[in-house]
Swiss-Prot record:
Source species, domain of life: Bacteria
Disulphide-bridged cysteine pairs: none
Lineage: Bacteria, Bacillati, Bacillota, Bacilli, Lactobacillales
Name of protein: Translation initiation factor IF-1
Family: Belongs to the IF-1 family.
InterPro entries per record: NA-bd_OB-fold, RNA-binding_domain_S1_IF1, S1_domain, TIF_IF1
Amino acid sequence: MAGNDVIEIEGVIKETKPNANFIVELENGARIQAGVSGKIRKNYIRILVGDRVTVEMSPYDLTKGRITYRHK
């Protein structure tokens, strides 16, 4: 899969799960499970319930995603 075959969408963290996974409610109302990207993990960026985030999703599996940015 090429690196440009991703869907980027914003959402809000609704709950936390073990191992740095989160339930994110997207702008369209859907809820997905998302993990944190490597750069967020490497730089120790804290993500809490209620934070607004940008999520990358594969067009092949719309139930999982990767958190790539936490908005201020």
